[in-house]
């Protein structure tokens, strides 16, 4: 039985690395939807960055939002999910996302970007659906 599980995990990891499996969406974020999100380092939403995302888990890699990254859910329970991501440019990060309401979440993120460490907390609020013709990130 252990050999079968090991083989399945090895095959799954290989296919995932090759981009043949779609990313699994965290259950903790299921009540939230993609769309326009205002993201700020301030709890009151001061000076937000507005991003259009297909799913909220993309906000886990906010520091690398314009990079090609792969995300792996490493913990997912209740209203909290932990996501590790690795980017093609060598950057990486780990984010703990907590769903406050279906339209509000926090992201505690840390990692390496441009060869330097980063660590900060983000507050994200869903503002609505993305407008037609605007690229999603």
Listing of model-derived features with the role each one plays in the protein:
Residues 1-6:
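Positively charged n-region of N-terminal signal peptides that target proteins for export
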Residues 23-34, 75, 128-136:
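N-terminal helix-cap/turn-to-beta initiation motif at the start of protein domains
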Residues 32-47:
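Tryptophan-anchored aromatic micro-motifs
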Residues 45-102:
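Central antiparallel beta-sheet cores of small beta-barrel/beta-sandwich binding domains
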Residues 90-95, 106, 117-121:
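Short, surface-exposed coil-to-beta transition loops
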Residues 114-137:
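Edge beta-strand at a domain terminus
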């Amino acid at each position: 039985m252990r050999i079968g599980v090991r083989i399945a995990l090895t095959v799954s990891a290989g296919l995932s690395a090759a981009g043949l499996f779609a990313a699994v969406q965290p259950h903790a974020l299921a009540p939230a939807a993609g769309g326009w999100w205002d993201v700020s380092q301030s709890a009151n939403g001061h000076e937000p960055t507005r991003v259009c995302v297909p799913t909220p888990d993309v906000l886990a890699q906010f520091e690398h939002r314009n990079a090609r990254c792969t995300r792996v859910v490493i913990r997912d329970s209740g209203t909290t999910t932990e996501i590790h991501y690795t980017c093609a440019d060598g950057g990486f990060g780990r984010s703990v996302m907590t769903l406050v309401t279906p339209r509000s979440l926090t992201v505690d993120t840390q990692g390496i970007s441009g060869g330097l460490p980063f660590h900060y907390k983000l507050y994200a609020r869903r503002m609505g659906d993305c407008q037609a013709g605007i690229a999603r990130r």
